[in-house]
Regions:
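Carbohydrate-active enzymes and regulators
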Residues: 1-116
Length: 116
């Protein structure tokens, strides 16, 4: 049964019956990769990692690898991205847009805390 899932999704996507999404390749929290201070916006008063870090190029690479893998599996790039844990920030949204995704998914509570 499991061997039939990817081919079925691939065929449905190629026929235009579904839009598929992916997540960043190794499932990182993109806002934290972009800037560890993003945690403070969502959780004021929470301790921040020491030393602080910002690796936006790693976020771009995670998205690029996800696009490559998805395209290899499903025959076309994904339409959208579902960020790990639904996490978003302005920097993560910019990285997602730069990567060429048309949409991203999250939820209202996360969006309200993210300032995105």
């Amino acid at each position: 049964m499991l061997r039939k899932i990817v081919p079925a999704y691939r065929a449905a996507a190629l026929r235009g019956q579904v839009e598929l999404s992916c997540s960043p390749y190794f499932h990182p929290i993109l806002p934290l990769l972009c800037d560890s201070a993003a945690h403070h916006h969502a959780h004021p008063g929470a301790p921040l990692p020491e030393p602080p870090f910002a690796w936006p190029a790693d976020a771009d690479a995670q998205l690029a690898r996800a696009l490559q893998a998805h395209t290899a599996w499903f025959g076309q790039p994904p339409c959208g991205v579902w960020p790990s844990e639904g996490s978003v920030s302005e920097a993560a949204a910019s990285a997602i847009a730069r990567a060429g995704f048309r949409w991203m998914a999250s939820d209202q509570d996360i969006l309200a805390r993210s300032r995105a």
